[in-house]
């Protein structure tokens, strides 16, 4: 009877070790997946920042420069007026 209890205790210990190792692996996987999801979200936010902020500002800058060049091309020359 004593030997059966010893084998049962060893079996429970091994099963406990296996459960502990599996739990640690799952915890590590969850942490790694959370880190990768956070990294991916940061990359997406940077892309959205590029789309919403950088691209429109470059567009506005280029259009403003085009209008400025067009205005300088079509404006009449300054007339010399004698001081009165």
Curated annotation (Swiss-Prot):
Residue stretches spanning the membrane: 19-39
Protein's cellular compartments: Host Golgi apparatus membrane
GO cellular component: host cell Golgi membrane; membrane
One annotated GO biological process: disruption of cellular anatomical structure in another organism
Topology Virion surface: residue spans: 1-18
Membrane topology: Single-pass type III membrane protein
Keyword Transmembrane appears in the UniProt entry: yes
Positions on the Intravirion side per record topology: 40-80
Signal peptide segment: none
Keywords: Apoptosis, Host Golgi apparatus, Host membrane, Membrane, Transmembrane, Transmembrane helix
Principal location: host cell
Purpose: Plays a central role in virus morphogenesis and assembly. Acts as a viroporin and self-assembles in host membranes forming pentameric protein-lipid pores that allow ion transport. Also plays a role in the induction of apoptosis.
HAMAP family referenced in this protein's UniProt entry, alphabetically: BETA_CORONA_E
Subunit structure: Homopentamer. Interacts with membrane protein M in the budding compartment of the host cell, which is located between endoplasmic reticulum and the Golgi complex. Interacts with Nucleoprotein.
Family from the record: Belongs to the betacoronaviruses E protein family.
Stated name of the protein: Envelope small membrane protein
Biological source species: Bovine coronavirus (strain 98TXSF-110-ENT)
């Amino acid at each position: 009877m004593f030997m059966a209890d010893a084998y049962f205790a060893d079996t429970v210990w091994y099963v406990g070790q296996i459960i502990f190792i599996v739990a640690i692996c799952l915890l590590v996987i969850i942490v790694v997946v959370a880190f990768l999801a956070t990294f991916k979200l940061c990359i997406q936010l940077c892309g959205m920042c590029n789309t919403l902020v950088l691209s429109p500002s470059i567009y506005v800058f280029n259009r403003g420069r085009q209008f400025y060049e067009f205005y300088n091309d079509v404006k009449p020359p300054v007339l010399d007026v004698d001081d009165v």
